Amino acid sequence: MLDTNPSSRFTVLLPNEQEEWHRTVRGLLEPQGIQTLSARSGREAIEMIESNAVHVAVLDVQMPQLGGMQVVKRVRELHASEPQRRLPPAILVANDLTSHLLREALMNHVFSVLSKPVDYSLLLDALARVVRRHYESRWPGFQ
């Protein structure tokens, strides 16, 4: 079950196939008290979501092995029999925001879709909106 205990730090899962991007985003988030985890592939992202208290997952549509959309679908399938389990909201990043991708994201309850290269202020805004909508306007881990 997703840990939403106020004593746990707000945790963001980030794709890590582009080390420089990951390092930059981690550098923006960690000084604000946000813990980051990294996944080099879609399969690793699923493992991280299953074994950690992930509050939001940022997933690249073109991650190796399984793309971000496939990760979202697979995690939902794995927990279809557990309606009480709170799955982390997903933010997808993609090179090409096609109408098909946006429609698929909407049908799969993806929180936000951002165009690559990702504007860091848009990513921070999307994370703030996740907090407002899913965590009662408080970063988990902060009183």
Feature-to-residue mapping (PLM):
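Non-catalytic signal-transmission and effector/linker regions of two-component phosphorelay proteins
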Residues: 1-23, 83, 121-143
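Two-component/phosphorelay signaling modules centered on CheY-like receiver
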Residues: 19-37, 108
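Acidic catalytic/metal-coordinating carboxylates
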Residues: 41, 67-73
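Short alpha-helical segment
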Residues: 44-45
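His-Asp phosphorelay/catalytic-motif detector in bacterial-type signaling
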Residues: 53-55, 80-89
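Active-site beta3 strand of CheY-like receiver
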Residues: 53-58, 63
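The feature encodes the CheY-like receiver
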Residues: 64-67, 94, 98, 117
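Alpha4 helix (beta4-alpha4-beta5 surface) of REC/receiver domains from two-component response regulators
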Residues: 70, 86, 96-113
